[in-house]
């Protein structure tokens, strides 16, 4: 037995076994190191992916605002605004391609002081040379000052309209479009017929020219109307009123004897100032007549 033990101690098989055990232990240690390294790498990868996800989220947040700005710019660029001439050379009709006040609705802004109820009208009056603004169902009429140039006014009006419709703000605040032709309970039969004829036959035609006609009153055969938009200062407005509107009303409603144009206070002041300006120019010319020298005038 002791020999067997002694032999086993001396036997190379033990060394082999011991060597195998050492090798196994070494391999096991190596595997543990690999596993530890793998776990460390996995943890590092998770941290890297987590950091990357956070970075991507931050980048998305940072990019969101420029993308919204880009979308806004695309919206603005996608709007195609057309212009249309009117019988009045000082008025131009702008067609943004979207609804403005809706079918049959209009609103007149004869001056900047009347634009308190409309953010869009306020912005348009800031354009140099704009004298009056008028909103229709799907159009905007701009009336310029007499010495204004469309070449300078049009680009600014285009920019204002595009920016405003892209903003999504309401066109009117606490204001109703014209409802002058709305049938009221106390309207007599003649007034009802006048309003209906204005609303169905006359106003649509006038609105195509960038203006409108507002019913004021009817009394003793006289219909009083107010011209708006491009029609308010149009040189041919009187001809339109007499030859067009009056003739049509008299044809369908025999009770109508004549049609008269009504001017509000703003129109009266503007006309008064214009007449005074013309008078001062004439007086200046008469006070300083041209001097003739050698058959020529200076």
From Swiss-Prot:
Pfam families on file: Nfu_N, NifU
Summary of the function given for this chain in its UniProt record: Molecular scaffold for [Fe-S] cluster assembly of mitochondrial iron-sulfur proteins.
Region: NifU, residue numbers? 194-262
Q: Where in the cell is it found?
A: Mitochondrion
Kindly list the positions annotated as binding [4Fe-4S] cluster. 231, 234
Q: Please state which protein family the record places this protein in.
A: Belongs to the NifU family.
- Main localisation, per the record? mitochondrion
Q: List cellular component terms (GO).
A: mitochondrion
> Which GO terms of the molecular function aspect are on file?
iron ion binding; iron-sulfur cluster binding
Please identify the protein, giving its name as recorded: NFU1 iron-sulfur cluster scaffold homolog, mitochondrial
Q: Name one GO biological process term.
A: iron-sulfur cluster assembly
* Keywords tagged on the record: Iron, Iron-sulfur, Metal-binding, Mitochondrion, Transit peptide
Give the organism, scientific name. Answer: Drosophila grimshawi
Per its UniProt record, what InterPro entries does this chain match?
A: FSCA_dom_sf (IPR034904), Nfu/NifU_N (IPR014824), Nfu/NifU_N_sf (IPR036498), NIF_FeS_clus_asmbl_NifU_C (IPR001075)
């Amino acid at each position: 037995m002791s020999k067997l033990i002694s032999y086993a101690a001396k036997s190379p098989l033990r060394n082999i076994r011991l060597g195998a055990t050492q090798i196994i232990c070494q391999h096991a240690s190596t595997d543990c190191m690999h596993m530890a390294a793998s776990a460390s790498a996995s943890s590092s990868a998770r941290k890297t992916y987590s950091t990357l996800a956070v970075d991507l989220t931050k980048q998305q947040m940072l990019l969101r605002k420029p993308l919204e700005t880009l979308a806004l710019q695309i919206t603005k660029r996608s709007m195609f605004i057309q212009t249309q001439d009117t019988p009045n050379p000082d008025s131009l009709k702008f067609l943004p391609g979207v609804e403005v006040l809706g079918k049959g609705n209009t609103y007149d802004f004869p001056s900047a002081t009347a634009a308190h109820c409309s953010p869009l009208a306020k912005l348009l009056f800031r354009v140099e040379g704009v004298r009056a603004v008028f909103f229709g169902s799907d159009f905007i009429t701009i009336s310029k000052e007499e010495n204004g140039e469309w070449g300078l006014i049009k680009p600014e009006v285009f920019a204002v309209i595009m920016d405003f419709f892209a903003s999504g703000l309401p066109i009117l605040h606490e204001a109703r479009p014209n409802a002058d032709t709305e049938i009221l309970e106390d309207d007599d039969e003649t007034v009802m017929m006048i309003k209906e004829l204005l609303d169905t036959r006359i106003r649509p035609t006038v609105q195509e020219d960038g203006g409108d006609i507002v019913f004021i009153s009817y009394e003793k055969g006289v219909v009083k109307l107010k011209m708006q938009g491009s029609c308010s200062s149009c040189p041919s407005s009187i001809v339109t009123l007499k030859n067009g509107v009056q003739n049509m009303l008299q044809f369908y409603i025999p009770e109508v004897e004549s049609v008269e144009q009504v001017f509000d206070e703003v129109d009266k002041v503007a006309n008064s100032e214009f007449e005074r300006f013309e008078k001062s120019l004439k007086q200046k010319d008469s006070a300083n007549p041209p001097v003739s020298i050698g058959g020529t005038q200076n």
